[in-house]
């Protein structure tokens, strides 16, 4: 049977993460952002057609994917969030197709410096790199997290072997990641916010021209967002499968309370 999740209960990926994921499990989902790797679950978003095959007992057959290590070191600076880390990685690998149809495996000493919800925020955005799936090594943070939704038995330690071979590696020093923004028309079109503010007119004009070359009908107007030399923000949204994490909602609540 099915499980009905009311809209006021959870963002659906947060619900699946909390209630269905587990270390060493695999989940096939219809949504492209099906990613629960931070809890040791290989989750793949394949679309409704593939899911329908599962409902009638068919197998899910794929060739062995390549595996790329995402080697994390350091610790994020204050104010740098999971979306900043994710966008930095997406911006580095997307155009080159470096992780396309591969598994991104997050390892390294920097993993221990990230709370689980922080890892979730990075993990769910790996879809935008065109990777097939993503998985993280698990640790004490993972073990401490799973009893919160009432599933301590879902924990298993997952780590690379002492000698592990990969098809590639992306080295990320978390201490160097800056607050980052993605501009239209794809999350790979990234800039450090400091760079965008310093060169707002040039960057937004280039982005506007590229975007309008891709769309028909109403044209994108970014230049009007520059007011008095600053960039005007119309709306702040904390939601969705990446931004709508519990930690993010709490952080925004704290900011609004002053």
Where are the regions that the model predicts?
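Fe-S-dependent hydro-lyases/dehydratases of central metabolism
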Residues: 1-258
């Amino acid at each position: 049977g099915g499980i009905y999740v009311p809209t006021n209960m959870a963002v659906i990926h947060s619900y699946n993460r909390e209630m269905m994921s587990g270390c060493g499990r695999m989940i096939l989902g219809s949504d492209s952002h099906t990613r629960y790797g931070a809890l040791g679950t290989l989750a793949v978003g394949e679309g409704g057609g593939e899911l329908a095959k599962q409902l009638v007992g068919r197998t899910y057959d794929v060739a062995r994917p390549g595996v790329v290590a995402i080697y994390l070191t350091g610790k994020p600076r204050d104010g740098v969030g999971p979306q900043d880390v994710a966008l930095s990685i997406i911006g580095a690998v997307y155009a080159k197709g470096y992780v396309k149809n591969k598994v991104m495996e997050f390892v390294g000493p920097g993993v221990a410096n990230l709370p689980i919800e922080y890892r979730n925020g990075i993990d769910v955005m790996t879809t935008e790199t065109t990777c097939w799936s993503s998985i993280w090594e698990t640790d004490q943070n993972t073990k401490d997290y799973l009893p919160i939704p009432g599933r301590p038995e879902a924990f298993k330690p997952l780590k690379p072997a002492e000698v592990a071979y990969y098809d590639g590696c992306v080295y990320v020093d978390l201490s160097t990641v800056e607050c980052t923004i993605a501009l239209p028309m794809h999350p790979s079109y990234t800039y450090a916010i400091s760079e965008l503010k310093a060169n707002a007119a040039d960057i937004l004009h280039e982005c506007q021209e590229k975007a309008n070359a891709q769309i028909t009908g109403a044209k994108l107007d970014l230049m009007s967002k520059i007011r008095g030399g600053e960039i005007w923000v119309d709306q702040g949204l904390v939601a969705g499968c990446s931004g709508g994490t519990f930690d993010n909602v709490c952080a925004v609540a704290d900011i609004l309370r002053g």
